[in-house]
Amino acid sequence: TVSRARADFGLRTFGADGGRLTLNGRVFLLRGEANCCVFPETGHPPMTTGAWREVLGRYRAYGVNCLRFHSWCPPEAAFAAADELGMLLQPELSDWNCTNALETPHSAAYYEAELRQILFCYANHPSFVMLTLGNELCTGEEGHRRMAELVRLARQLDPTRRYAGSSNGQYGEQGYDGVSDFYTAAAYGDRMLRATSSPMIGHLNRCRPGTRQNYREAAAQTGGVPVFGFEVGQYESWPDFDQIDRFRGITIPENLRAIRRRAEQTGAAAYWQAGVQASGELALRCYREEVEAELRTPGMSGLSLLGLQDFPGQGTALVGMMDAHLTPKPADFARPERFAAFFAPVVLLACFDRYTYEAGEWFTADLRVANYGRQTLAGPLCWRIAEGRTILGQGTLDAPAGW
C-alpha cells in the first residue's frame, strides 16, 4: 500500500422543483442564519469538530437548519459537525466587493482557484448544499460575465449543489442574473423581500401592523428560480453590560464600555435592565413578523437571518438573541424556545388586518398551516378565542396539507 485515505460521505439530493428548493425530493424551507466569523476570544474560527458541534448546536436550538458563511468558508471541522447534526451549510468565496467584483483577470483567477479548492476539499460532505461567489457583489459588464462563467464552472465541476453569483448581488436592484440556481436578496428591484431596509422602508416601517403582508409580487419575478430572503432582521436590543467581563481574549469591548459610561452619566443606568428587556422583546416580535411574512408567501423558499449573534463589526450591531460569544442573552426574550416557536418546520399562522380593534368591530382571520416537516398533517385544526378564562368563540377547521 503506497498511501491510504479515509473520508466520510453522505448521499442526498438538493435541488429545485417548481421554483422551490427541495431536499431529497421534498419541498424544503430554508431557516437560515448568517455567520460573520465572529469569534471574539480567538479572532479565528474553531478548528475541531467538537467545537463546531457546539456552535451549530447553539444555532439549531433557535430553529436554524442552514448556516450561511458571510463572505468566508469554514474549515472542514464545520462540515463534519454539520454532517453529524443534520445541518446544511452555504459557504461563500471571500469576496465582498461592492464596486468592481471580478473585473480584473487577477481577481478572477484568484476566486476561480478558491472555488475549485472548496469543491475539491469539501465535496464529500452532504451538509454542503449551496455556494455563492461572495456577499453583495457589485460590478460592471466584464465582472458579470466572469461571474456567470464561474457559476457555470461550479455547476460543471459538481452539479449536486446549488450556486449563485452573489448573495444580494447589486443589492437586488437588477434582479435575477439569468444564470444562478437561486436568488437571495433583500429585494427584487423596488419590491421588498423582507419587512425592513434602509432608508426606513418595508411594511414594518410604513404599514399599519397586521399579519397579511407577504412578498408574493417580488418572489414571482425570478421566473421559476428559488428565492429566499437575505440578511432578514437586524433588530437591535440594548446591551447587557455584564458581558463585558467575559471578553478576555483579543477583543477589547470598548464600544460596550463607552455605552455604559454614557448610561451612567445620563442616569439611564437606573432603568437599564428594563430597557434591555423591552428592546429585546420588540426585536423578538419584529423577527417573528419577518419570519411569518415569509411563511405567508407562496413560492418562497425561506430566508436567511442577520442575525442571532451580536455583530461587533462595522460599529456595533447588537442584533442577536445571543451575544458575540454565542451565549443566549440573560433575558426572557432571548430564550431559544421562544424564537424556535415560530422558526420551525410547522407553524400555525393567523392572518388578520390589524392588531387593534375597537368595541363593536368584527374580528376576522384566516388560519393557515405552514408545514415543511417530514409528515403530512391530517385531522382537524382546533381554534379558540378567549379573554382570560372566558371563551368568546371556538371551532374546528380541516388542516391543509402544507402551504
Q: Can you say where each PLM-predicted feature lies in the sequence?
A:
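N-terminal carbohydrate-binding accessory modules
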Residues: 1-60, 80
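Well-ordered beta-strand scaffold positions
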Residues: 26, 83, 388-390
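Generic detection of short hydrophobic beta-strand segments and adjacent strand-loop junctions
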Residues: 7-9, 174, 395-401
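Residue-level detector of high-confidence beta-strand sites
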Residues: 4-5, 30, 92, 394-396
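Carbohydrate-binding surfaces of carbohydrate-active enzymes
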Residues: 247-403
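Non-catalytic surface loops within mature trypsin-like serine protease
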Residues: 11-13, 37, 234, 371, ...
